[in-house]
Amino acid sequence: MNILILTPLYKISGRESLERNTEVIHHFAKYWVNEPDVNVQVVNTYLNPGRNLLFLLKKGELKKYFTPFDYEVDGVKVHLVEVQQIPFQNKFWKFQNKTIRKAIEDVAETFRPDVILAHFPVRYTGVIDRVCENIPKIAVMHYTDLWISQKHIHQVESIGSKFDVTFTRSKSLLEESKKLGIKNLSDFIVYSGVPYAESRRSADIAFSKDNPVKLLYVGKLIERKHLDYVIKAMGQLKREKNLMLTVVGEGPEKQRFEDLSKKYEIEGQVRFIGKLTREEVYRAMGDADIFIMPSVEETLGLVYLEAMMNGCLTVGTKGEGIDGIIEDGKNGFLVDPGSEKSVVETLQRILRLPNDEIQQISLAATETGKAFNEPDMAKRYLNRIRQLVREKGGNA
């Protein structure tokens, strides 16, 4: 079975100057190519901001922007074509569609796909019905697709009519997509997985009067992650419990968060340690008591699953991608979106739990994290693709 993946976000090799280098979709494809009857080809329609064109011009590398680039990573072949990042439905959108269509047709001519997967399908509604006729086409909705479809409602009709079926990336995204009325919407959720590894937790979590409770945040230091809510909550709870927060990551809001910890007079309890390797992050998770990231606009957030696999009492946000995987009070905790008060109340709730209940939740989190591992999630997704292709009479 030949699987053609369309996406504006994919792992990049050989073009280090390109910023949007993400592995989320590659975490599926790299397992699929190990199947004896499966070939995978990716068309990466990379969105390049205008400021990058000026950078390339200054370096004398503007020619690269206009030249498609082929590379291979972990056995997956990728055809990268750069298009300008412009507002949706801009008058230049049709010109971009021509570039995208040509890239798909050039690859499909020799690859001859049995099925097409479009991650971020709003980027392809202008071309998908004009390429590879009579081949099953699957749309996979991310939160970006939801936001654009809510603003440009005609996209709902396009996704529902130009693709054979639409999958989503989380339970909350599925529920929001149902509200839009997408005709071909499936209940199948394309869950991501974490690299399978043993938990780094060396001892059970147990709160005591003598030892501080160790909180951990891992992520970009940007506004929508709401690390400020955590720092403010610590400021309010500092007389109730000795809390220590380790912050892993970098970002434009770092100085603001540091200043906030000083404002609440807890700068000695908040450590900003920058970026870590995955192994170092796992060790930090194994040592932490509570992992907390009350972010919004989060399709899933693999870091939650990694924290759960390492036994952390994990705090996510209701209505976001992790909602439905975390069951509040059973294998983790959920706060209300955009609510500082909810963060405070949830931390208070956790800190007042008896140690036997804490250990039960930690164990349940570990089991959930291990269940959502990369190989199993990739196999689950591939089996659903095979089923659809067979239903359409194709080669699977």
Where are these predicted regions, by residue range?
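N-terminal subdomain of nucleotide-sugar transferases
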Residues: M1-Y65, G393
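Aromatic "clamp/platform" in nucleotide-sugar-dependent glycosyltransferases that forms part
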Residues: V296
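Carbohydrate-associated surface elements
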Residues: S172, G193
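Short alpha-helical donor nucleotide-sugar binding micro-motif in glycosyltransferases
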Residues: K275-L276, R283-A288
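Short hydrophobic beta-strand element within catalytic cores of glycosyltransferases
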Residues: L313-G316, I326
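Conserved donor-binding/catalytic core segment of Leloir-type glycosyltransferases
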Residues: L4, A206-K225, I231-M234, T246
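Conserved acidic donor-binding segment of nucleotide-sugar-dependent glycosyltransferases
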Residues: D328-G329, F333-E340, R349-N355
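Nucleotide-activated donor-binding/catalytic signature segment of Leloir-type glycosyltransferases, i.e.
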Residues: E258-L276
